[in-house]
Amino acid sequence: MTRVVLAAAYRTPIGVFGGAFKDVPAYDLGATLIEHIIKETGLNPSEIDEVIIGNVLQAGQGQNPARIAAMKGGLPETVPAFTVNKVCGSGLKSIQLAYQSIVTGENDIVLAGGMENMSQSPMLVNNSRFGFKMGHQSMVDSMVYDGLTDVFNQYHMGITAENLVEQYGISREEQDTFAVNSQQKAVRAQQNGEFDSEIVPVSIPQRKGEPIVVTKDEGVRENVSVEKLSRLRPAFKKDGTVTAGNASGINDGAAMMLVMSEDKAKELNIEPLAVLDGFGSHGVDPSIMGIAPVGAVEKALKRSKKELSDIDVFELNEAFAAQSLAVDRELKLPPEKVNVKGGAIALGHPIGASGARVLVTLLHQLNDEVETGLTSLCIGGGQAIAAVVSKYK
């Protein structure tokens, strides 16, 4: 079977809600990475066969945001593109689709990843097209409804985390401790420059003066403690334990990678970072969607012909501390190998981009001692996706 390799992998810094990227469309974030990858690899843009990009909150952006990003990123009009929506798994699903298209021989070179600007998601006025006869009308927050609400139960993703709290007997202190650890690891990694190799700075033009250049993730917080987090009120349930402090944030960002057949990489003298070994997807009851990574991880390992003990490093998306703790309990993961540079609770969770972001962060950890990695994300609606990669040899 054709070996599929990852030849370049980058991400933007992750902006907080209403932060540095609030006026930067998702497709501009994606375009920045596309342009960088082309420049970095020296690849002829016309040699790219397809562009596949995850993006969840598409309302108001224009037709096919992936195509917009591709064209603005400098690709010729002959290169096709399409947008993927698998909620939080969109970015990783895009990479899987790229992988599948190369294995089947349809493509040789694909740019794949994810992008999201949650700050720019519009408010919707449903049923207004033909006018209102009378009475009050309300707006729907497209970010909350299309990105963060379980449509089957009509409640926020946070309630699915509360459901896992009850099912697994997870305490508030455990969640807050997990969140503090995520922040501390991210602070340490940021201060040590461990994200520098994976981040492409984003230049934001200003009406007056020089552009603002964003180089670091905005959500990383120093001096976070369990004591401080314990003062926060429950966010989703009156007597609940899930708070803004032990859940991932609402964020803006993008991540992208160059997916190629090994033969094409050799032909073009491009040195790959890693080999894609296999993927797994799984579904569960939507009310406990956060536990779905367990099944996805098991499938990805089986298809990759690997055991959990073979994995040197894990990048698992931290949608909620409770969700992450539940998955850890089921899989019995070694904590020293999981999210060693912090996770989404600290870094942020731009939903359409996160699937690619966790893989980018994972790839930049591979070396002669850390050769095999696994990444996974839970997905609203009761799903999950996972991937296994190995350092290229």
From Swiss-Prot:
Primary location: cytoplasm
Broad class of enzyme this protein falls into: transferase
Pfam families: Thiolase_C (PF02803), Thiolase_N (PF00108)
Top-rank taxon, per record: Bacteria
EC number assigned by the record: 2.3.1.9
Active site: 88 (acyl-thioester intermediate), 349 (proton acceptor), 378 (proton acceptor)
Keywords: Acyltransferase, Cytoplasm, Transferase
GO cellular component: cytoplasm
InterPro entries reported in the protein's UniProt record: Thiolase (IPR002155), Thiolase-like (IPR016039), Thiolase_acyl_enz_int_AS (IPR020615), Thiolase_AS (IPR020610), Thiolase_C (IPR020617), Thiolase_CS (IPR020613), Thiolase_N (IPR020616)
Catalysis performed (reactions): 2 acetyl-CoA = acetoacetyl-CoA + CoA
Record keyword Ligase present: no
Molecular function terms from GO: acetyl-CoA C-acetyltransferase activity
Localization terms from the record: Cytoplasm
NCBIfam families named in the record: AcCoA-C-Actrans
PANTHER family the record matches: ACETYL-COA ACETYLTRANSFERASE, CYTOSOLIC, ACETYL-COA C-ACYLTRANSFERASE
Stated family: Belongs to the thiolase-like superfamily. Thiolase family.
Protein name in UniProt: Probable acetyl-CoA acyltransferase
